[in-house]
Each structure stands twice: as structure tokens, then as C-alpha cells.
Amino acid sequence: MDKDPRIADIDMPLHIAVIPDGNRRWAKARGKLPQFGHKAGVEAYRKLLENAGEFGIKYVTFYAFSTENWKRTESEVKAIMDLFLNYIKNYDSLIGPARSKVRFVVIGNRDKFSKDVVKSIERIENLTKDNDDLIAYICVDYGGRSEIINATKRIAQDVRDGKLDIDDITDKVFADNLYTYEAPDPDLLIRTSGEERISNFLLWQLAYTEFYFTDKYWPDFGKEDLIEALVEYSGRQRRYGGK
């Protein structure tokens, strides 16, 4: 399939990160419960992966459920977990023809999940481990501070065990102990709903990432919106801290 002419010749990001904000406000505007918005958000995620694959984007990291999201009502948390479980159990029918090309990696803390959820996570990761056209990181019970603390503990353990000299700790060593160690840092972060903050997401990895904010609620974010973000990204000059 030929790319849209607006992005046919642009500098395409290798890795995009997404904070899909606005599901609840989208539902409220329609007189619906939050669960309705989260369900629509799953469909928007499916379309995101489909479009990212079409455009040649290699990595998509999606902030599905943060460590702070446990503070929401019990009914809403259950609805989100049920949607997540349904997605990873039935991803082959939900993602469509692209299923043979997408590798799923679920990152975050799994300690609070039921055995059924953990088993389903392991299943989808195992079934898709050889797919390499698009790597889809799904962040669930994820927090950037927790990720950094966990990486620090692993490095400290290696130093204590004599596997690593403290003077050999570098940016790369630290990055290799993060959940996203197999991926380059995101080139572009997209956040929907008009909010302009990173909310404890990929705190280390976003050091030199370009940010794109849109007023669209996540369920309304589609192909045209992704194209707009990519076009704007391509017009920026990335300096990585230099002049």
C-alpha cells in the first residue's frame, strides 16, 4: 500500500510513545460510563497499530494503565482489566491482518495481576515473539519512577555480586536495565486530550523525545491525527541537547 503523499518522503520516527488520555471525558460527553470510553479506546489502539505498521514505524509504546490508575473506582479498574484481558486473549481477531507482523511486549509490574492475566500476558508474548515488523510495548501497572528504581536495584545487585564495576556504569548500562532495553528511545511522544505533561511515563527514555499534544480525546484519535503528528514531527530540528 502506498503511503499518504503527506508522509511519503518525511523523516519517519522509528519509535513513538503514546499517552492515550481522555477516554472518560469522551464517554461523559456522550452520557456514558467510563467503561464505554475505555472500550472505544481499545479500538483506537487497534487502529494505531494498524496505521503505524502501514507507515513503517517500528516501535509503539502505549501507556495503557499506570501505577496511579489503581486509585480509580473498583468498578472502573475491573472494567479496564477485563478489557485488557479480552484484548490479549483475542488479539488475533482484534488486530486483524496485521497480527502476524506485531510482537507484543507487556511491561510493568505484574504482582497485582491475577494468575489468569499473567498467563495470558505470557501467552501473547510467546505467540508473537518471532514477529518483528512492529514491536508493541503495552505499559500496564507501569510507572517511570518505579522502573528507574528497579533498574537501579538490578545494577546495585550486579555491583555487589562483582559482575559490574561501579566505574563502568554508563547511560547504556542503565538503559539496558530498563523494561524497554531492546528499543531505542522514543523519537516522538503523542498525548491526547489537551493535557501537556508526561505523568510518570518513560522518565529516562523521553530525555530527547519530541512532544506532540492534541486536544482530541483518545477514542477520536485516528489515521488523520497520526499523520498530522508525523508531519509536525518531521518539521522539527532535533538537537539532542546541542545547538
Which role fits each region the language model picked out?
Residues 1-243:
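Flexible, compositionally biased loop and terminal segments
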